[in-house]
């Protein structure tokens, strides 16, 4: 079975920095440490309210990341313009609400088809690979195909938040089915949201998955074990699931 890649989301390094309005800890430094520890890519979410990652971070990270930069962003003219100026390797289009603590669900691609298709086309024409962050739903996968996006990222939050083993298994089966369906259509499949050291293995074991994007649990463990070890330990969990 092929190995699975780890994209490390470093948003919450910026959250910690912004809590005191200081210049540290710097997400640029975090990206370097994460890459040395085995991260296959670095993910950042430039939110419209700039609550963690800011424009300066995006600009410098694009110049310094040694692996691949994945820029998460809302489908707005401002964000598309920033992406076209920055030219990260990947853009993941996500839904965004100012009042949410974190992204609460997948993008309604089917309900915003023309808007998302237009953004996808602009980014693709600039040589940027586009992923759409969606729930594990066939209608949304079909809409992704219609948009021309080569990647989806399946939302694993419902799986991560399930309160019983039965509910978690049901969510895992939905994700597995969606991954198989998307893969069959020629779409590459990533996944992420709410994944931890305790729940990542069943997701990582799904053979169609190309990459997992994980942030909060890694940054949280880094507070106790250091970022290098936190990233390396997550990579071990994921690769063990593929053996």
From Swiss-Prot:
The active site is at 45 (proton acceptor), 72 (proton acceptor), 193 (proton donor). The record marks 153 as: Transition state stabilizer. 3-amino-2-oxopropyl phosphate binds at residues 9, 20, 194, 215-216. GO terms for molecular function: pyridoxine 5'-phosphate synthase activity. GO terms for cellular component: cytosol. SUPFAM superfamilies: Pyridoxine 5'-phosphate synthase. It is found in: Cytoplasm. Pfam families: PdxJ. 1-deoxy-D-xylulose 5-phosphate binds at residues 11-12, 47, 52, 102. Homooctamer; tetramer of dimers. This is Pyridoxine 5'-phosphate synthase. It comes from Photobacterium profundum (strain SS9). The lineage of its organism: Bacteria, Pseudomonadati, Pseudomonadota, Gammaproteobacteria, Vibrionales. The gene is pdxJ.
